[in-house]
Amino acid sequence: MTDQLESFSLEVDAWIEEHCPESMRTPMPVSEQVWASSDINFPTTDSKTWFDAMVSKGWCTPEWPVEYGGGGLSFEESKILRSRLKFFGCRPAQINFGISMLGPVILEFGTDDQKKEFLPKISRGEIWWCQGFSEPGAGSDLANISTSAQLKGREYFINGSKIWTSEANKADWMYCLVRTAKTEKKQAGISFILINLRQPNIDIKPIKLLSGQSPFCQVFFDDVLAKESHRIAAENDGWKVAKRLLEFERTMMADLGSEGAVDVEPIKTYKNSKAIDAPGQLKLHKKIIKHEMRNHLIDLTMARTGIESKVGFSPAALILKYISTEETQTRWELNVTSLGAGGLEIVEKSQGPKQEIAKSFFYSKAYTIAGGSSEVQLNIISKHILGLPS
C-alpha cells in the first residue's frame, strides 16, 4: 500500500469513529434495514444519523463522480473504504438496487441528462427501484418477453405484465425490459425503459408466499406512459443494457450475506455453542475451516472482477454468482448445525441471533434461484465461457 493510500485508510478509520454510532456497528436485523425510497423510513435515530453522514460524504456511491452525488474515489480508495467499513462492522447506510445495479448502467449507457436526473437521487436514496424483467411467459428465457411499448410522439404506451417483481408495491420506479419491435431474433426488438410507478393504469398485486409474506408482486400495465427520454440506449438495443445490468446483479448476488441482513460467521456460532458433542466437533470444525478458506478465495476473485468489469465483460461475474450463492447456503447450514437440535427453532415475534440464523437459513435457499438459477448459470458458463456444445 502506498503512503497516500495508507493515509487515506487512517482518515477513513477516524471518520468512522466520529460519525458511525455504536449501534450501527452491530449485525443488522431485517427489521432495521433502511430502504431507499421517496418516503424513506428510519427505524432508529442512529440509522438516520449514519445514513446522513454517508450520503453527505458521497460514500454510498464512493466511485461515482462528485457531481452525481458520489465520493469521487479511485478504485483503490473505494476498496479500502469497503474494507474498513467491514472491519468496523458498519451496517450499510441504505439498501438500494439503484446503487448496485441501475446506477452503473446509467453511468455506462445513459445520456448526460439521464445521469443528472437520476444518479444524484439514487445516491441520496430518494428512489425505491424495482426490476421489471420476468414475465409469466419469460423467466429463464428472458428474451421471450411480450410486454409492449409503442412510441407515440415523445411517450411510450406500455401494455403487458411483469411477475416476481421484488417489492414492486413499495417501489417508486421500475427499470423495465419491453418489446418495441417484433424481430426474428427476439433479443433485437427489446428496449430498456425507466417507468414511474406513481401513475394511473398500473395494477400491482402482491403474491402471498407459504411464509405468509409477500415480497414478490405481479404488475399489470394498461397504456402506462413512459417518456422517450427515459429510455436507456437506443430503441431495440436494450438487450445489451440488460446483459450488463445482470452482470452487476450477479456480482451483488455473489456478495449476499457480506452486508445487508444479519451476517453471522459459522466459526463464531461454533465457538459460542455447546450443542455439538465432542466426536462431532472436529468434523464440523474442518467443514467450517474449508468454508472460511473458500470465502477468502471468493473475496479475492471479487476484487479482481471489480477491476475487470471496469473495461467490459468479466466472465468471473457469472462464475462468482454460482459459487457464492452456493457458499452462502453452506454458511447458514453450518450455522444451524453449530446450534444443534434447536438450530431451526422459530418462535413467533421472537428476536435474537438464534432467530435470525434460522430465518436466514430458510431464506438462503432462494439465493440459488434469485438473479438466475444455479442450473441456468451452469448452462451459461458451459456455453459462453467454456465453449462446450449445447
Give each language-model segment a name.
Residues D3, I202-I298, Y367:
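Glycine-rich beta->alpha junctions and the first turn(s) of the following alpha-helix
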Residues I80-L81, M101, W239-F248, M253-E259, ...:
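Glycine-rich phosphate/cofactor-binding loops in nucleotide/flavin-utilizing enzymes
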Residues R154-E155, N159-K205:
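A short core secondary-structure module
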Residues G125-F133, L177:
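A short, Trp-centered hydrophobic/proline-enriched beta-strand micro-motif
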Residues Q94-D113, G139:
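N-terminal glycine-rich flavin-associated loop
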Residues M28-S31, A275-P279, N295-S350:
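C-terminal helix-coil-helix/basic helical segment that borders enzyme active sites and/or dimer interfaces
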Residues M1-N96, E117-R124, A254, E265-K274, ...:
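Amphipathic, small/basic residue-rich leader segments at the start of a protein or domain
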Residues T147-Q150:
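A structural signal for short hydrophobic beta-strand segments in well-ordered beta-sheet cores
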